[in-house]
């Protein structure tokens, strides 16, 4: 078998134009569209339109006979694959892997034209930024007539102690009459553990005994190298290489979740699939970076909201140690937007679930499958029956992993009364399309009542979920699941221990600012196994639902053009942790150091419009050039008993912190260009301190890369922070300064932008503006060895450069997933 990455050297065009551009995959076509206040997608996609696109590539087929197919990890959406003008396959859904067999259509030993037609023109079809085009990898598979099916290797750890027992099922396409054998070997240093079996119709089943077993967990992500070979008469017909961790899962209401028999609580982050300024394009290095930052900040689990997670992210979670709840869809058979996947649910749900499970089932990080999110029809008899069929289908593919679904009990209750709460959001989108194309339309909408309502939305949803009617509208669905997924329903956690004593609960979606109370319940109640905040990482689309505005700026739930970023992320789209992250780290006891945050001194705080999914607008900075003499509101996050805050050595007082104060101490003082120091104490003893400094001396640009060496494979990317700093290296809170980035040598500029929630420029341009002193550039390596010179320039603050190296020698970024 030859398995070749097929990402490089494509041509791409909008279907409505003749002009073509050379592109390498992954590629997000939506990111190249012009955002507009009149976009039919509205705030869902951050005011990006969809479109129709054509990708094409000329490929010289080998002269040798054999099975040839193309394997697509993700195309958004309604794709058709053509070979020499003849249709070979495709996929309706935008998040489903699929294979297109092409050997019967190619001319052997000659050039062949591969085309992929993509139609994302029906709008709206998503509640968030979807991207468009071939946004994940494409593989060329050249195989014999006897082959291991894609996703056809299924490993399950049956017993785990000093030795481990692993069951292996290998699914085979056996088109010949030969006597075919399967051999599976697992190795972690030393000699491999292996087993061999003859292939029966459909495949083979084997049992492998692994001595001196080293288990996989998020705390200790040990991975074995696995080789699966298909042989006949000593000839290797096909093989797959993968990595696998020995891991068992048990869950019940009395003992909670156990991984390898060890009690485990899930510190979870809901994440969308987009990569911030890279749009929907999935780059392996970007997924590893995101997983690494999430792990460093204290998360041990992610929920893929609300579509199957990428293979690259799965590899990252396996390697770095993150548990995964992989989710299949946001819709079943009732639409949430006019043209979404509900319209073809009946014909696609089985294939979509199967693709997800077959992708996931060799990954030890995957500890839960979710069959949907906020499916209001799950409160109906028809929906419960659909759930029953879906759970059975998942179990037929992998019975070793529990199944859940994110259920919003308030929505179920409303649906039972004939109300569709998603319809109101569509009306708001239509209303927002009247906004101007300059900056958010200003109107006198702010009021004490509005801010009170928005700040209490999470509590209102939880209280609604606690009503008997919500229980009645949801219990049938929960009876079908292994784990009941509660969206915004923490008010039920304690009472449902009595009402439903056998029910295991996970907080599939929660407000980040509820983490203190939620986590106390997770630690106390064995039937509640974790909490997944919305969101761990910020995302594009659902524009402005977590963004605070000021003065006469729009206070609507979803914000008008040009808002693009959602805003609720504990970590922003560039990878910088914010106040919600500091709160969670304090609650989880991840650090003894207090975290200082300051409400923005570059905005008018007298008229503040809160956002439903964000409890604070505070920023981790004391470098505000426009703040001199203004009143500063300071938040210090800590799990200590108390916090003292000092300004230039002068005490501003001592405040309670820790659980009694919601893990935050609040101070007020006049801003001055000095140094803030927070000191955390437990029983009077200092346990940690932190500092924020004001700006000192002249300002200049600084550019920093997350890596110095890139693989020269056309796929590796480096993330470069471009910052406005003072002479001491402190990032200064200035926004709006124009910035240009140039890339010379063996790399290209792939993305440039910032965490600005309402940018006017494009992430595909070489120019952007600083947002609170920062921007992010992403550089992609070419296939050439050499050097990449990246330079950032500002008219006012000069320039800064860094030189990176591209090398073919490294194998750390190798794409090995099966």
Predicted regions and their residues:
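Active-site-adjacent substrate/metal-binding segments within catalytic domains
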Residues: 34-60, 65-83, 89-92, 141, ...
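Substrate-binding clefts and catalytic carboxylate motifs of secreted carbohydrate-active enzymes
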Residues: 4-5, 11-15, 75, 123-124, ...
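Short aromatic-acidic-glycine turn motif
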Residues: 189-196, 655, 700, 742-758, ...
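Short, hydrophobic beta-strand segments
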Residues: 102, 206-216, 665-671, 764-783
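Accessory beta-strand-rich segments of carbohydrate-active enzymes
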Residues: 3-15, 45, 49-150, 175-176, ...
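Short flexible loop/turn segments that cap and initiate beta-strands
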Residues: 179-184, 219-225, 631-633, 639-641, ...
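Extended acidic/polar, glycine-enriched regions
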Residues: 107-109, 169-252, 670-673, 682, ...
């Amino acid at each position: 078998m030859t398995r070749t990455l097929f990402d490089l050297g494509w041509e791409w065009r909008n279907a409505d134009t003749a002009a073509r551009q050379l592109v390498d995959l992954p590629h997000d076509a939506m990111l190249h569209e012009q955002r507009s206040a009149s976009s039919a997608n509205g705030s869902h996609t951050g005011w990006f339109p969809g479109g129709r696109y054509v990708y094409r590539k000329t490929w010289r087929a080998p002269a040798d006979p054999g099975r040839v197919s193309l394997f697509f990890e993700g195309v958004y959406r309604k794709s058709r694959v053509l070979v020499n003008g003849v249709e070979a396959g495709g996929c309706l859904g935008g998040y489903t892997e699929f294979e297109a067999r092409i050997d019967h259509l190619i001319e052997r030993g000659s050039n062949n034209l591969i085309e992929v037609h993509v139609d994302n023109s029906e709008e709206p079809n998503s509640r968030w930024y979807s991207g468009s085009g071939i946004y994940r990898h494409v593989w060329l598979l050249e195989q014999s007539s006897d082959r291991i099916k894609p996703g056809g290797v299924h490993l399950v750890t049956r017993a785990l102690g000093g030795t481990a027992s692993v069951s292996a099922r290998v699914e085979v396409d056996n088109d010949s009459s030969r006597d075919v054998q399967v051999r599976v070997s697992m190795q972690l240093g030393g000699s491999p553990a292996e087993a061999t079996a003859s292939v029966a119709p459909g495949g083979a089943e084997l049992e492998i005994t692994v001595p001196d077993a080293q288990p996989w967990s998020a705390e200790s992500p040990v991975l074995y190298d696995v080789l699966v070979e298909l042989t006949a008469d000593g000839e290797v017909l096909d093989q797959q290489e993968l990595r696998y961790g020995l891991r068992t899962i048990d869950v019940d209401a009395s003992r909670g979740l156990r991984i390898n028999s060890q009690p485990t609580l899930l510190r979870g982050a809901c994440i969308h699939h987009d990569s911030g300024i890279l749009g929907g394009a999935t780059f392996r290095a970007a997924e590893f970076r995101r997983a690494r930052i999430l792990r460093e900040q204290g998360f041990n689990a992610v929920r893929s909201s609300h579509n199957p997670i990428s293979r690259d992210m799965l590899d990252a979670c396996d390697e770095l140690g993150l548990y995964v709840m992989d989710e299949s869809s946001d819709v079943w058979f009732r639409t949430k937007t006019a043209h979404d996947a509900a319209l073809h649910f009946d014909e696609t749900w089985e294939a979509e679930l199967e693709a997800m499970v077959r992708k996931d089932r060799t990954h030890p990080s995957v500890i839960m499958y979710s069959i949907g999110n906020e499916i209001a029809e799950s409160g109906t008899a028809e929906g419960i029956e659909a759930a029953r069929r879906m759970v059975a289908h998942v179990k037929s593919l992998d019975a070793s992993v529990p199944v859940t679904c994110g259920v919003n009990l308030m929505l179920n209750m409303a649906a039972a009364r004939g109300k569709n709460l998603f319809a109101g959001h569509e009306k708001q989108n239509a209303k927002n399309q009247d906004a101007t194309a300059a900056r958010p339309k200003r109107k006198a909408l702010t009021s004490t009542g509005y801010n009170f309502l928005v700040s209490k939305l999470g509590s209102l949803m939880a209280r609604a979920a606690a009503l008997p009617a919500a229980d009645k509208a949801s219990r049938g669905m929960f009876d079908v699941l292994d784990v009941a997924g509660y969206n915004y329903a923490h008010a039920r956690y304690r009472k449902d221990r009595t009402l439903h004593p056998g029910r295991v609960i996970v907080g599939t979606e929660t407000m980040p600012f509820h983490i203190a109370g939620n986590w106390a319940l997770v630690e106390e109640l064995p039937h509640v196994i974790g909490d997944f905040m919305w969101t761990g990482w910020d995302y594009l689309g659902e524009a402005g639902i977590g963004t605070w505005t000021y003065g006469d700026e729009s206070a609507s739930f979803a914000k008008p053009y040009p808002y693009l970023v959602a805003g609720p992320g504990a970590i922003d789209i560039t990878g910088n942790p914010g106040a919600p992250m500091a709160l969670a780290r304090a609650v989880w006891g991840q650090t003894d150091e207090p975290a200082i945050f300051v409400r923005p001194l570059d905005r008018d705080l007298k008229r503040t419009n809160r956002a439903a999914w964000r409890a604070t607008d505070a920023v981790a900075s004391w470098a505000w050039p426009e703040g001199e003499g203004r009143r500063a509101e300071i938040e210090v996050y800590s799990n200590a008993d108390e916090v003292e805050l000092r300004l230039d050595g002068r005490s501003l007082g001592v405040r309670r912190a820790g659980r009694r104060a919601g893990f935050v101490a609040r101070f007020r003082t006049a801003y001055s260009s000095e140094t803030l120091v927070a000191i955390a104490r437990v029983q009077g003893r200092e346990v940690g301190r932190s500092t924020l400094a004001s700006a000192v001396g002249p300002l200049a640009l600084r550019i920093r890369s997350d890596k110095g060496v890139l693989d020269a494979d056309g796929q590796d990317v480096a993330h470069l922070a471009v910052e406005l700093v003072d002479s001491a290296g402190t990032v200064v809170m200035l926004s709006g300064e124009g910035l240009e980035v140039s890339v010379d040598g063996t790399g290209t500029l792939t993305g440039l932008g910032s965490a600005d929630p309402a940018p006017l420029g494009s992430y595909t341009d070489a120019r952007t503006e600083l947002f609170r002193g920062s921007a992010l550039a992403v550089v992609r390596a070419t296939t050439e060895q050499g050097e990449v010179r990246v330079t950032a320039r500002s008219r006012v603050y000069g320039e800064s450069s860094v030189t990176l190296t591209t090398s073919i020698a490294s194998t750390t970024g190798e794409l090995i997933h099966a």
